[in-house]
Amino acid sequence: MSEVKYWIASISKEHTKRGVAGNFIQVCRGKQAPLNRMKKGDYLVVYSSKLSMEGNEKCQAFTALGKVSDDEAYSFQMTESFTPFRRNIEFFECEETSIIPLINDLGFISNKKSWGYPFRFGFFEIKEKKDFDLITSKMLKDEIARQYL
């Protein structure tokens, strides 16, 4: 089995709620390529910069945490003209966690003044497990739950 990887997806809080309810993730306006980078067993943290995709109200929090539970991306016809790609995710019960107090300690944020820059791409790998551990230590208050990550 390949090495477990850790990912962040930037998704509005509103869309995150839909994904959690349906046990799926959709990123980068439905593109397949980013989803294909994940493998079954990888972990995913969702960061929501805004409450809704159309609005401007800030959220700036990690809003969901889960594990990839399928083998590949699949298409899903949402409307007659929009068929995005998705991955199935086993989401964990967790607490929404503000990014603000974590910025200085997250290694993937190299420029602390422009801390939002990495999230503009919509999807990226967390290269250092300590960053994933820091985020999940705030999202999962239950010590037992953290043992399974």
Regions found by a protein language model. Name each.
Residues 43, 49, 68-71:
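An acidic- and aromatic-residue-enriched active-site/binding cleft used to recognize and process polar
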Residues 45-46, 63:
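Hydrophobic beta-strand signal
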Residues 58-129:
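Aromatic- and Lys/Arg-enriched surface recognition patch
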Residues 10, 47-48:
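Short His-Asn-centered micro-motif
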Residues 48-54:
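Short, charged beta-turn/beta-strand-edge "cap" motif at the junction between a beta-strand
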Residues 1-40, 136-149:
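Compositionally biased, charged N-terminal/linker segments
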Residues 14, 52, 74:
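Surface-exposed, flexible loop/turn segments at secondary-structure boundaries
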